[in-house]
């Protein structure tokens, strides 16, 4: 399962967030409330990775685990989390969500600009800050041409983003396994894009899993280029599953490196739980938060 498979359900209004009785039982087994965290890392979780829970149940779960943010929600989902006092740490637009059709192709600019011009004021009005975007796949477009296309299109929405205090964040994906042909698949490419756009309201969503797969050198990359990174995602390598000792990344050291940069934004868990038992899936999120709470 990956995020692309969840996009269609989001557009249909379900977001894939249905709750089975077994999931409910597992959810109710968690008795801890307001687990004290150290406060050096602001934690979040990507909604699509816990899609066996209803969104309001996921809100209650994250509060029981001691944090108060959820990633990757569209405007129609915000009222649900607002009722629970939960923050949307990374927003979608209300329109078409495509990881493969993005800013690197001028033929997409008209609908993208329309969607983002509508979404930016909504994000600001809701009290949120981050709005995700995607480069799109190459589809034969040269990387340099694609970058210039991104610059041309994104600059048309930057004044509005700056006016509203919204940060547009392009996600870095690996093209080796999960997102073949995706253009923004190297941190160097994304960093150069940030430099060309030249606004504090455009940054990169540095996905630790994706960049470990595509290029490695995670801690050094963060230390050297943290000013271009506005958000972080986690998952284990290989497999995109739990971030425990079954995979190769040592997340406590990565989190310490992030905290040492002075970063005050969110780190969102985006691993796909490998266990089929819902109680174990919830336990995995609890464990991941503890691992990252340095």
Regions found by a protein language model. Give the residues of each.
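Histidine-acidic metal/acid-base catalytic patches
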Residues: 2-42, 47, 52-63, 127-129, ...
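Active-site acidic/histidine proton-transfer and metal-coordination neighborhood
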Residues: 10-12, 16-19, 35-37, 104-203, ...
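Active-site-proximal loop/turn and secondary-structure-junction residues that shape catalytic pockets
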Residues: 49-51, 74-76, 94-96, 137-139, ...
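Catalytic domains of carbohydrate-active enzymes, especially glycoside hydrolases
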Residues: 58-77
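Short acidic, glycine/proline-enriched helix-loop-strand junctions
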Residues: 78-92, 150, 166
């Amino acid at each position: 399962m990956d995020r692309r498979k969840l996009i269609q359900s989001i557009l249909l209004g379900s977001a894939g967030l249905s709750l089975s009785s077994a999931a409910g039982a597992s959810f109710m087994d968690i008795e801890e409330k307001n687990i004290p965290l150290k406060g050096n890392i602001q934690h979040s979780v990507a909604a699509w990775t816990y899609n066996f829970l209803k969104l309001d149940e996921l809100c209650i779960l994250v509060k029981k685990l001691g944090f108060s943010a959820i990633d990757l929600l569209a405007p129609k989902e915000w009222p649900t989390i607002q009722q629970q006092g939960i923050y949307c740490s990374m927003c979608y637009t209300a329109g078409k969500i495509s990881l493969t059709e993005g800013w690197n192709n001028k033929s997409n600019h008209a609908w993208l600009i329309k969607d983002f011009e509508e979404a930016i004021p909504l994000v600001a009005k809701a009290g949120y800050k981050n709005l995700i975007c995607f480069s799109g796949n190459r589809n034969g477009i040269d990387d340099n041409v694609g970058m210039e296309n991104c610059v041309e299109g994104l600059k048309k929405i930057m004044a509005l983003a700056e006016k509203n205090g919204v940060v547009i964040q392009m996600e870095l994906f690996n093209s080796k396994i999960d997102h073949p042909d995706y253009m923004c698949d190297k941190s160097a490419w994304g960093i150069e894009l940030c430099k060309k756009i030249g606004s504090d309201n455009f940054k990169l969503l540095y996905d630790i899993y994706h960049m470990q797969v595509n290029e490695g050198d995670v801690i050094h990359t963060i230390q050297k280029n943290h000013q271009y990174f506005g958000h972080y995602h986690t998952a284990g390598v290989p497999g995109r599953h739990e971030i425990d000792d079954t995979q190769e990344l040592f997340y406590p050291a990565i989190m310490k490196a992030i905290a040492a940069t002075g970063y005050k934004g969110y780190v969102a868990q985006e691993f796909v739980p490998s266990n089929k038992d819902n109680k174990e899936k919830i336990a995995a999120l609890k464990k991941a938060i503890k691992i990252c709470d340095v």
